[in-house]
Amino acid sequence: MKRTLLIWASMACMTVHSVTAQDAAVNKIIEIGQTDNQVMDHLDVLTNRIGGRVIGSNAYDNAVEWVASKFTEWGLEVELQEAGTLPVGFNRGPWFGKLLGENGMELHFVTPSYTAGTKGVQRGHVLQEPLTQSEFDRMKGQLKGAWVLINGKNVGWPVDRSAKGDSIRAAIISENNETAKKNRQIMEDNWRNNTDNPLLPLKEDVPALFYKQMCEAGVLGFIQSATVPLRALYDKAIIHDPTFTFDNLPEVCDIKLDEHQYAAIKK
């Protein structure tokens, strides 16, 4: 019994000593935080000097190297390990836009990472996206050099360019074509019978129904309404598909515009 008590007494002393040392370290950290706080300086470097740090960008690599250098400076041993490989990289350049004309304005917008930029300043007319095959056929000749307003409310992701996205768009186009056919019959009946029956609504909740066709027609880019504050995420297909190369990257801009400015332009 006496031996047992001595062991427990020894363990209790060790625990007290350990807790005391831990408390001293915690108190020192709190003191430094109160008297020599560097949080805002570090945040300034990361957000203003380095900026956005999407994976696959030079800014991400710069941020990793800077953080590693700070840890080394504080006496820590640092080892950088590769977490994975991306098929292509992405560096964001400057962006700006302006609506020209009588009610001109500076445009407030973002573009998702890993989407296409422009080759310098691109000026063009604005069109509303087509919802049926007949609408596309009528406006096809006007699409070259146009900025196209597309439907839907964006939350940061780019237009879905995947095969699944193509399939969804094709199904809605087919449905809209049938609705347009019914609407033509309704209009004929209204004219013939002097009635005023309402037309059936077309589906427009999925953006850029004729995405590939409009790209092939030579549009400058797509503009979609986005809620404020604006969010710019990334093209998931490029990030997760190792078969992507510089030869099959997106080539048309995908702009997410302040919803209020979008509404003003659409009017």
Which residues does each PLM region occupy?
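Bacterial Sec-dependent N-terminal signal peptides
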Residues: 1-23
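Extracytoplasmic/secreted envelope proteins and their assembly/folding machinery
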Residues: 23-27, 40-43, 47, 61-68, ...
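N-terminal capping segment at the start of a domain
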Residues: 23-57, 83, 234-238, 242
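Noncatalytic luminal/extracellular "stalk/propeptide" segments of secretory-pathway proteins
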Residues: 35, 44, 48, 52-186
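Hydrophobic residues within beta-strands of alpha/beta enzymes
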Residues: 148, 222-223
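Surface-exposed loop and adjacent secondary-structure segments within mature catalytic domains
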Residues: 163-177, 216, 223-256
